């Protein structure tokens, strides 16, 4: 039994939190891009 396996153990909650933060950031970015596009379309109609 070496030290290898114990080093690779990560806290599952940390992994989940990391994924959640990434997902939220990605969603915010997409929303912002859609908002910018909508604003451009709106301004071109005036």
From Swiss-Prot:
UniProt-recorded name of the protein: Diuretic hormone
Upper classification of the organism: Eukaryota, Metazoa, Ecdysozoa, Arthropoda, Hexapoda
Biological function: Regulation of fluid secretion. Stimulates primary urine secretion by Malpighian tubules and causes a dose-dependent stimulation of cAMP levels in the tubules.
UniProt organism field: Locusta migratoria
SMART domains in the cross-refs: CRF
Residue positions where Isoleucine amide is found in the record: 46
Record keywords, A-Z: Amidation, Hormone, Secreted
Domain of life: Eukaryota
Record keyword Lyase present: no
Main localization category: secreted
Disulfide bonds: none
Record family assignment: Belongs to the sauvagine/corticotropin-releasing factor/urotensin I family.
Localization in the cell: Secreted
A GO molecular-function annotation: hormone activity
Cellular component terms (Gene Ontology): extracellular region
UniProt xrefs under InterPro entries: Corticotropin-releasing_fac_CS, CRF
Pfam families named among the record's database cross-references: CRF
């Amino acid at each position: 039994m070496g030290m290898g396996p114990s080093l690779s153990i990560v806290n599952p909650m940390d992994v989940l939190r990391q994924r959640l933060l990434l997902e939220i950031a990605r969603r915010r970015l997409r929303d912002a891009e859609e908002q910018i596009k909508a604003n451009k379309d709106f301004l071109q109609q005036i």
